[in-house]
Amino acid sequence: MIKSELVQRIAEHNPHLYQRDVENIVNAILDEIVAALARGDRVELRGFGAFSVKHRPARAGRNPRTGEHVPVDQKSVPFFKTGKEMRERLNRDNATSEANA
């Protein structure tokens, strides 16, 4: 699912909201998550999961084409850990679909 599909589904389930308003809300939520991560904060959505930033140290890498050793700078990468309720639902839904197969 892409963002536009998410917006469309939310708008369908909430006919009192205009689709452009739903899009603005979704964008605002995502912008706030990114801003919090940029500040170094952890974003926890209970039952869904938690977003955080992991810091990868600088290391020696290798160019796969030439085999040359190259330095790789340190970097920060986003990390998402699923919440307990999401894991349980995914496992329950997966078990149900496998039983029906």
Curated annotation (Swiss-Prot):
Pfam families in alphabetical order: Bac_DNA_binding (PF00216)
A Gene Ontology BP annotation from the UniProt entry: regulation of DNA-templated transcription
Gene Ontology molecular function: DNA binding; structural constituent of chromatin
UniProt keyword annotation of Transcription regulation present: yes
Sorted UniProt keywords: DNA recombination, DNA-binding, Transcription, Transcription regulation, Translation regulation
CC terms in the record's Gene Ontology section: chromosome; cytosol
Cited CDD domains: IHF_B (cd13836)
Residues covered by region (Disordered): 57-76
Family listed: Belongs to the bacterial histone-like protein family.
Physiological role: This protein is one of the two subunits of integration host factor, a specific DNA-binding protein that functions in genetic recombination as well as in transcriptional and translational control.
Record's subunit section: Heterodimer of an alpha and a beta chain.
UniProt xrefs under PANTHER family: DNA-BINDING PROTEIN HU, INTEGRATION HOST FACTOR SUBUNIT BETA
Identification of the protein by name: Integration host factor subunit beta
Taxon lineage: Bacteria, Pseudomonadati, Pseudomonadota, Alphaproteobacteria, Hyphomicrobiales
Gene: ihfB
